[in-house]
Amino acid sequence: SGGCVIMGTAAGPLTELAQMLNLPVTNTLMGLGGYPGADRQFLGMLGMHGSFTANLAMHHSDVILAVGARFDDRVINGAAKFCPNAKIIHIDIDPASFSKTIKADIAIVGPVDSVLTEMVAIVREIGETPNQDAQAAWWKQIDEWRGNRGLFPYDKGDGSIIKPQTV
């Protein structure tokens, strides 16, 4: 999620949709705070200043729901390599935001809070959930990435000396 989640007061419906569908969530720098950072489904910020887990999850995704994100150069790190196998659904209030740097397979124009609220209602009405076996395998992979490199990928030592990177 990007800055429009914050500006469009869409954190509530974004959180509700992600939790209903058990989806992993990443944020851009401008979108930080748009999803609870302590929630298990939050993978961290993506891009050059983001987490290893968030970047790998995005890269290996089959579908990306981009909510109010700009796809700037610090996030995509080269359009040709960005999420090569993903279908991208992009929600934004500004139609000029679509396909500037990353092609949107589906572009949804509208206020992000209204669009997400409607999506929540549709998911409730349909009553279907994602394939649980596929989703369990995906979360297992994400948890493996978290365990390997997480937010603290360095050796913390034996604890007798505090290393600068732990502060």
Task: Describe the role of every protein-language-model region.
Residues 6-10, 32-36, 72-75, 96-99, ...:
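Flexible loop/turn segments at secondary-structure boundaries
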Residues 1-2, 67-68, 111:
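Glycine-rich, N-terminal phosphate-binding loop of Rossmann-like dinucleotide-binding domains
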Residues 1-40, 63, 120, 136-167:
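Cofactor-pocket helix-loop regions in the catalytic cores of large enzyme subunits
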Residues 27-29, 40-46, 64, 101, ...:
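Short glycine- and Lys/Arg-enriched binding-loop motifs that mark or flank ligand-binding interfaces
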Residues 85-167:
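Phosphate/pyrophosphate-binding active-site segments
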Residues 10-13, 76-80, 101-103, 120-121:
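Short amphipathic alpha-helical segments
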Residues 47-98, 106:
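Phosphate/diphosphate-binding loops
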Residues 31-50, 57:
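Active-site rim loops that border cofactor/substrate pockets in soluble metabolic enzymes
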